[in-house]
């Protein structure tokens, strides 16, 4: 019991301390947009990657944004947004499919570490989304990922154009809506205006991140 109380006290103190250093979600979004612009132009400045930064972070972390992204090795989040050590709290799974462990990680970064911007980041030519569209035979637990993405594949099956890329965007939009409604932490923080959750798609062939419009995301509910 004593250990539990100590842990709870530590978390609360951490929360209070970090609240003073929180970055407004709009400011955080601007940082990401500007960082990706540098990266896609080949003008990355690679901030916060010095030995001094390593030592500084040994005392704690204060990321300014949370990225919920795909595990694809071609989309390293810190690099495509031109950020450094301790800047981003990243949760990655194939197809950026979220479940209880992911939700707990996101809530921890939001409520305890103070990151008030959450970006759901998909990408073009996503293998997990392609599998949900084409429904091939897959091994083991891969089917759980495909099943989670199938609603996006079904919602876009009659659209003209590239069906996989349409499903990629729809999958991101549906995941944004899911997180916005996630109780009790995120839904309240979003409703109060403290937290912003947005969706984006990284384009493998250009290095550019496209942020989805709010109209598109709301239409996917």
How would you label these PLM feature ranges?
Residues 1-5:
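Positively charged n-region of N-terminal signal peptides that target proteins for export
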Residues 20-62, 85-86, 95-113, 130-221:
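Divalent-metal-activated hydrolytic enzyme cores
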Residues 61-66, 72-78:
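Active-site alpha/beta core segments
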Residues 66-69, 89-92, 119-121:
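Structural recognition of the beta-strand scaffold that forms the well-ordered cores
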Residues 69-74, 94-97, 123:
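Short glycine-enriched loops at secondary-structure junctions
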Residues 119-134:
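Glycine- and Gly-Pro-enriched alpha-helical subdomains that act as flexible
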């Amino acid at each position: 019991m004593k250990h539990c109380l100590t842990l709870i006290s530590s978390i609360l103190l951490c929360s209070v301390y970090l609240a003073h250093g929180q970055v407004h979600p709009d400011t955080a979004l601007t940082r990401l947009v500007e960082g990706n612009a540098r990266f896609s132009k080949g003008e990355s400045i690679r901030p916060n990657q010095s030995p001094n930064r390593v030592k500084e972070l040994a005392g704690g972390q204060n990321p300014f944004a949370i990225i919920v992204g795909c595990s694809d090795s071609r989309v390293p989040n810190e690099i495509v947004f031109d950020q450094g050590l301790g800047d981003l709290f990243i949760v990655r799974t194939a197809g950026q499919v979220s479940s209880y462990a992911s939700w707990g990680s996101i809530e921890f970064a939001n409520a305890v570490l103070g990151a008030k911007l959450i970006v759901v980041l998909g990408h073009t030519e996503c293998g997990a989304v392609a599998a949900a569209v084409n429904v091939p035979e897959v091994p083991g637990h891969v089917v759980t990922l495909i099943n989670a993405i199938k609603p996006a594949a079904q919602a876009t099956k009659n659209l003209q154009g590239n069906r996989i890329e349409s499903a990629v965007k729809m999958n991101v939009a549906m995941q944004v809506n899911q997180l916005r409604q996630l109780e009790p932490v995120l839904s309240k923080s979003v409703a109060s205006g403290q937290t912003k959750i947005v969706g984006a798609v990284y384009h493998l062939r250009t290095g550019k991140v496209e942020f989805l419009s709010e109209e598109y995301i709301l239409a996917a509910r």
